[in-house]
Amino acid sequence: MSGWRRIYYTLLDLPLKLLVRSKVIPADPRAEAGLDPRQPMMYMLPYNSKADLLTLRMQCLKQGLPDPLTPLDIDGVTLPRYVFIHDGPRVLTWYAEKSQSVSLFHNYLDLHRSNPALDVQLVPVSVMFGRSPGRESQTSQPAPQLRLLNGIEKFFAVLWLGRDSFVRFSRPLSLRYMATEHGTDKSIAQKLARVARIHFARQRLVAAGPRLPVRQDLFNKLLASKAIEKAVEDEARSKKISVEKAQQNAIELMEEIAADFSYEAIRLSDRVLSWTWNRLYQGLHVRNAERVRQLAEEGHEIVYVPCHRSHMDYLLLSYVLYHQGLVPPHIAAGINLNFWPAGPIFRRLGAFFIRRTFKGNKLYSTIFREYLGELFTRGYSVEYFVEGGRSRTGRLLEPKTGTLTMTIQAMLRGGNRPITLVPIYVGYEHVMEVATYAKELRGAAKEKEGLWQMMRGLRKLRNLGQGYVNFGDPLPLATWLSQQVPQWRDSIDPIEAQRPSWLAPAVDEIAATLMVRINNAAAANAINLCSSVLLASRQRSLTRPHLLAQLACYFELLRNVPYAPDITVPDLTPEALLAHALAMNKFTVEHDTIGDIICLSRDQAVLMTYYRNNIQHLLILPSLVASIICGHPGIERAQLQQRITLLYPLLKAELFMRYSKQELSPVIDSLIAELARQGLVDAQETRLYPAQTRLHVLQLLAASVRETLQRYAITFSLLRANPQLNRGTLEKESRIMAQRLSVLHGINAPEFFDKAVFSTLVATLRAEEYISDTGDAIDEKVSEMCDILSELITPDVLGTIESASLLAHGPASAALPAD
């Protein structure tokens, strides 16, 4: 670099270092974007901007990547390490050389023709100062966030938006591959430049999103739609009001529903949330975000479908997506959050509000469906919670399918962009509403959201530990429907909302698939692992060595026989994990002369069931295997497989587990092999025995499934006692008996007698043909399950269930058989 050029860049670099604090996307470009600094590397930027180039240089030096200002010397030929795709205005037009991207590409390709060993990585990089998409009324102005700026505009962009800047590294393109597969002549270089322009245009759309509508223009367009016109006429006729009054009602509903997205609100909230997260959370862990970026760049309409743990979810997900270089979505939020001042703030951050029920209000349901369809048509990403509300137990709830149905109906309008559903697992080490959830499960009335409740909640925000956002396996709707409902395209109608016969069963299956994929991306952490161990112990307490041994067992199970490829397990030793958990002040440590005892008080144990339930599905099968082996020393493998095969459909329905019946057998074999490797099980030919040297670890693992089996025993006991029980009565009596059992045996889990759990169980009994179409129990199948369950439950609990069955339905012979 010449002396004058060095002075020029140095002078330009000084103010940039003061004004610019750019974020790198992805966070680790070497690992996540596949950049290898050992190979020759060339950077490709969209616009001729020295500010962009020097911002890129700052990040390259931080990330250990080659300096873009250092030329490449190849076979005695010196070439620039960067290229601008577009020429344009510069601060010093008399000084800066004209960009000649096609000529430079051709020179590089020519070097590859003469040197077969050469392979230069061409790395596309976008540098963004601000990401405002602009408003649709600004038709004469191109989107400002990545457009070509003159020197004065760029100066003010850096001055105002330097702290809201992003450097986005894309995966490199191998120029060796281009030269080998496509040749090295100038037409290939021209094609490469054209493809680069398309790539950067897509990235601009991914980063900023489509233009935002003027709200009144959006309302006018919705009012003009045929569906809403008809709904307005029906409203006027049914309520005996004028059409003008019905239209006014429609506009009021639109005002209630529609978001008022503001980029400035997003920027301000990012500052506030960055400050907040850094003080409340010890870390935010994001996995598989590259999947979503790839989908967005390929032009997919993305619908984010997270699990719902807390009111924090809304803010956390938008924050994470923004920092992953993606547009924060329009979020379906419950109408209960539309209170001052939260409602107006959420609305500007992209929230649109939805009532709990649409029943009896055709105008509302039509407007909501048309608004959702309009969001898809305009290309905005959308987020909704398919569970319909926050989980009070820590488990996934049965999905509510209304919004999902509307999503598929929007696709049946015949839009051009493919719609893809992205399941998201959200996990916390501390959920501020957990104590409230426990009260509600015990029968307390749900507190209404409002300013006072929000202020009380803010006071509780402290030491939230780690947060986890894991993006699951995406579900492309068109692909899924083509496989499951080949004739689905016959139902496409650009005008009317369609309800073909296949829609309801398809929606139910898609919803269940999404729940399974959310669980497939679960995050184990210090709190849910330690809670799982301590809650399995009889007195909710363990010595430190026993607790560490159990954590080591769980770590090895989750790492060596992972539940699913997308689950995450802490990269810590058991000792480090326990130290972190104790620092969260959720566990009590008692000291004596022998050593430490880690405990949970009775009240705290109730709250910790929430965190245990977050990952219960990860450990339930290993626990069931351990339980059967402990209860049947010397059991044949085939018998163990047979028992688990019978019990598994109940677990699968309750916990949204991923394995089909065909996949179950090899999974069980893998778990047995892992337990044997850990020295917990002694496998002798076809028989399985508990290993006496580590019996305590195996028994504690087995205890994790204890409460689940007790619940099943209650329901099957009632069925056996009275095969004619109808489903509603069976659910009710099961809950009553579960409450009795929890009092008599100190069961602290609020979900033990949760209505939804028994409702799912009874529905599964019908699906698995334990109950006939007429509602009667199938004696042989029920008796077989009763026999299996009676062998896995302790005599004291079994006695309580038997006595309760006697009181409810008479003969003792109808209850579970005693040991």
Curated annotation (Swiss-Prot):
One of its GO terms (molecular function) is glycerol-3-phosphate O-acyltransferase activity. Its EC number is 2.3.1.15. GO terms for cellular component: plasma membrane. Keywords: Acyltransferase, Cell inner membrane, Cell membrane, Lipid biosynthesis, Lipid metabolism, Membrane, Phospholipid biosynthesis, Phospholipid metabolism, Transferase. It catalyses: sn-glycerol 3-phosphate + an acyl-CoA = a 1-acyl-sn-glycero-3-phosphate + CoA. Belongs to the GPAT/DAPAT family. PANTHER family: DIHYDROXYACETONE PHOSPHATE ACYLTRANSFERASE (PTHR12563:SF17), GLYCEROL-3-PHOSPHATE ACYLTRANSFERASE (PTHR12563). This is Glycerol-3-phosphate acyltransferase. It comes from Sodalis glossinidius (strain morsitans).
